[in-house]
């Protein structure tokens, strides 16, 4: 069991993207920072907002890239390389079109599934895709042509409440995730639905 040393929350920078579906991962990391009572601060060296807390004697770093989504890997690779964090000790939280709002799933490895943030992270980590993912369901607009506007849009209140609930579920299993007990975390998280 590999303990998680880096949690990344994907999103786009700037007030125009706050509370959009595409920023679900960033929202998750903001909630962790709040729960741990640490402040995310800008760090140019890592192209993002960073914070650190301790869990069972281990340092856990938080990162929200301040690059645009399709350059997220630049930020992740800079921090992971500096602190010598291996891909299997990284958890990337991101929005997931293929899951309905209110559903969160953990996964290790795999492709990018069309997600530009994941695509760039895989490329910047030297084509290593063995990092963990927290997939936060946002639903699908039903037509591929509508995806861009959909992910960059704000969810209606009922959808946002479901997304918030799925983030709460994920926060509930975070101690198991941090300890590297993904089997236990997955059993618990995958049985939840808002």
From Swiss-Prot:
One record GO biological process: rescue of stalled ribosome
Reaction(s) this enzyme catalyzes, per UniProt: an N-acyl-L-alpha-aminoacyl-tRNA + H2O = an N-acyl-L-amino acid + a tRNA + H(+)
Localization (cell): Cytoplasm
Gene Ontology CC annotations of this record: cytoplasm
Catalytic residues identified in the record: 22
GO molecular function term, any single one: tRNA binding
Assembly and binders: Monomer.
UniProt family annotation: Belongs to the PTH family.
Role of this protein: Hydrolyzes ribosome-free peptidyl-tRNAs (with 1 or more amino acids incorporated), which drop off the ribosome during protein synthesis, or as a result of ribosome stalling. Catalyzes the release of premature peptidyl moieties from peptidyl-tRNA molecules trapped in stalled 50S ribosomal subunits, and thus maintains levels of free tRNAs and 50S ribosomes.
Protein name: Peptidyl-tRNA hydrolase
Taxonomic source organism: Pseudomonas putida (strain W619)
Name of the gene: pth
